[in-house]
Amino acid sequence: MKCKTRWEKKFDCFGREDGNILLLFAGSLTVLIFFIGISMDLGLIYLKRNALKNLCQLVKEDRFTFQDSIRYSNNPGKDSFTMIEDAIRRNHFDGTVKVYFKEDIPETNYRYYKIRTQLSEEYSYTFLKIFGADTTTITVYFDGGETYGEGISDVIWHPALPVSSYNGSYTSQPDGSFGYDSADLPADW
């Protein structure tokens, strides 16, 4: 009869595992890589979304530069879109720019309009492509507007066109033109 040494007795329990620890290690490593990959994609989406928000903030800060140009424009919806899109494109944005413009029917001493700028860009997944997900659209927007005219004696300039001719959405097209839809306004307006 063979007598086992003390060390052989201690490691004898590992001989009965038949690779279970190895399988457990491989499985947990696979799960860990999966969660790291998903975290990486979500982190990159978050970074892209923050970059779009920064562009929105840039245009929002420029609104005082554009304010009089919009105020005295014959077509303030189209001119708002043109100015906003130019500012966005100068900052190397290649996605879709959509500007919603809505002005209330002006009175002789009062004028109010709202502008919503919406930026959309495609994000191509890095890790989730393994599971068949290719792209997702990241969209951010910000609202702005202006009210002017306070007193009864204020005289406010208005465009000759009725507000229904320039209220709506203006969407950039890949060829550099834009599309106009008078019925497309945000639901929460």
Please report, for each region that a protein language model flagged, where it lies by residue:
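Short, conserved structural patches
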Residues: K2-C3, W7, S69-W189
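Alpha-helical assembly-interface signal, strongest on the long, hydrophobic N-terminal helix that forms
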Residues: K2-F81
